[in-house]
Amino acid sequence: MSKPTTLYDKIWNDHLVHEAEDGTCLIYIDRHLVHEVTSPQAFEGLRVAGRKVHAPEKTLAVVDHNVPTTDRTKPNPDPESAEQIATLAQNAKDFGIEYYNEFDKRQGIVHVIGPEQGFTLPGTTIVCGDSHTSTHGAFGALAHGIGTSEVEHVLATQTLIQKKAKNMRAVVYGTLPDGVTAKDIILAIIGEIGTAGGTGYVLEYAGEAIRALTMEGRMTVCNMSIEGGARAGLVAPDEKAYEFLKGRPKAPRGADWDAAMRYWETLRSDDGAHFDHEIRLDAARLPPIVTWGTSPEDVISVTGKVPNPADIADEAKRLSKERALHYMGLAAGTRITDITLDRVFIGSCTNGRIEDLRAAAKIADGRTVNGNVNAMVVPGSGLVKEQAEAEGLDKIFIKAGFEWREPGCSMCLAMNPDKLKPEERCASTSNRNFEGRQGFKGRTHLVSPAMAAAAAIAGHFVDVREWH
C-alpha cells in the first residue's frame, strides 16, 4: 500500500524532472504567464543568447501593471510605463507568444485572466514574474511567483530549478457569518501565523469553510498566501473548479476534458498524509477585518481598537509596530470605526472579480459616497467589466458616486497614474499595506469589497454586518 501523499507532493512528483544529491530539483512548468514589468530583461537575455521561447503555446502575455484605467485612447502619461507596454507587445510578436494588449477585451490583471481563459488548470505547474501567482492555486495548481532571471529560464527551457518546500495546512472549519468573507479568512490566517509563518512551506487550505467558498473566494484566499510567507497556496479541486473551467477558451474539450477529469479527481491530499505544520480556525468566530499597520499581519476586528505597541514584550517587534503607527498617523486605542478615509479602492487580483463587484454594489445600491471620499472601482479584466455592465453594476456604482474604470492593477501599487498622495488614507481591497505601496507616504488599510464600499459611503470604517 502506498504512503499517503499531500496534494502538493502529488503535483510536485508528477513534474519532477531531476533531483540532485543536495536536494536541488528541476521541475517542468506547464503554464507561464508574462506581464510588462518583469519580462523585458528576460526576453533581452534570450535575444543576446540567440534562443527561442521553448514552448510559446504554453506562454500567455498581458499588460496590467502600468496601464492607465482611464481613457486609453490618450497617450500614457508615464514614458517609462509606455515603453514597458510597447516592449512587451514587440517581444510577444518577435517570440510568437499570444498577447492581450490594453485594447483587447480579454486584457486584465494576469491572475484574473488566467483562470477566466481556462489557461489555469488543476494539477498544472504555473509561474509568473509576479508574487501573487499563488492565486491560481485555488484550482489545485502549483503556482508561484518567480524572478526575472527565472522568467528567462522558463522561457528558454520550460523548466525551473528549485528545492522542494515543506507542507503546511490551514483548516478553516465551521460556517462564515453574514458579512464575513474570504478576504477576512486570509487576513485572519496571516494575523495568526505572521508574514513569515509560511516561509518554506506550500500552504494547503482545507475545511468546510474553504469548500463552501466560490472559486472567486478561493482565489482571494490563495492570492494572499505570499503575504503569509508561503511559496504557494493550494485548494484541492472539486465540482466548483470543474464547473468554473468547463467551456473556457483554453480548457480541454470532449475526450481531452474527460481524460483531464480522471486525473483531476485524484488531486487531493490522502487521508493520513503528513503535514509539517497545521493551523485551525473557526470560521464562525471571524469578524470583518481591517489592517491597522504597515504589514498584512497587522489585523484587527472592525469593532476593535488600534493596539498599543507598549504591550509587546519583544523590543524589535515593539519598535516596528511603533514605526507603523507613526507612519499610519494613528494613536493606540483609536476605535477602528473612528478612522476616517480619503480614498477607497475596489479592485486588484485579490478582489477584482465579478463576485467582489457584486458584493460592493449590493452595499452601494441606493446610497451615496461620502463627500470627503474619492472612491474607484476597477474591474479585474475586460470580461469582468463587460459582465458587470451587463448586470448593471456600473450604473449602481456611478449613481452612488464611485468612479468606474478600465481594467488593470490600478491603485494596488504605485506603478500607474492611480496613486495616493502623501498621507492620504485608503480602504483598499488589494493585498499589501506596506509603506508607499499605493503611493509615497500613502496609508493603506486592507479590507473586503463590502467593507470598502461601506467605508466609502460612511466616510469611515463601519461594521458591514450592521448593513446586511
From Swiss-Prot:
E.C. number: 4.2.1.33
Reaction it catalyzes: (2R,3S)-3-isopropylmalate = (2S)-2-isopropylmalate
Keyword Cell division among record annotations: no
Binding residues annotated for [4Fe-4S] cluster, in chain numbering: C349, C409, C412
Cofactor note: Binds 1 [4Fe-4S] cluster per subunit.
Subunit note: Heterodimer of LeuC and LeuD.
Family note: Belongs to the aconitase/IPM isomerase family. LeuC type 1 subfamily.
Protein name in the entry: 3-isopropylmalate dehydratase large subunit
Species, as recorded: Nitrobacter hamburgensis (strain DSM 10229 / NCIMB 13809 / X14)
